[in-house]
């Protein structure tokens, strides 16, 4: 039978296609990891803004009120 391409050329084409698909999979995995990290940072920011900052604000506010009035630090 006649062959349209030689064995070496066919192997090169197949290897090139496989390398291209491997690169695409690598890019997809990298993008998925970066997206997950970005989502994690976003969620950590929500926790910081909604829980940590108000707690620190209330703590410092009560401490300032107690120190200015001469009341012992019972609330802190």
From Swiss-Prot:
UniProt topological domain (Virion surface) ranges: 1-16
PROSITE patterns: COV_E
Protein name (Swiss-Prot/TrEMBL): Envelope small membrane protein
Membrane topology: Single-pass type III membrane protein
Ranges of the Intravirion topological domain: 38-76
Transmembrane segments annotated in the record for this chain: 17-37
Encoding gene per record: E
GO cellular component: host cell Golgi membrane; membrane
Disulfide bonds listed in the record: none
Quaternary structure annotation from Swiss-Prot or TrEMBL: Homopentamer. Interacts with membrane protein M in the budding compartment of the host cell, which is located between endoplasmic reticulum and the Golgi complex. Interacts with Nucleoprotein.
Pfam family, one: CoV_E
Family: Belongs to the betacoronaviruses E protein family.
Subcellular location: Host Golgi apparatus membrane
Any Gene Ontology biological process: viral budding from Golgi membrane
Protein keywords: Apoptosis, Host Golgi apparatus, Host membrane, Membrane, Transmembrane, Transmembrane helix
Miscellaneous section: Bat coronavirus 279/2005 is highly similar to SARS-CoV (SARS-like).
Cited function: Plays a central role in virus morphogenesis and assembly. Acts as a viroporin and self-assembles in host membranes forming pentameric protein-lipid pores that allow ion transport. Also plays a role in the induction of apoptosis.
Xref: CDD domains: SARS-CoV-2_E
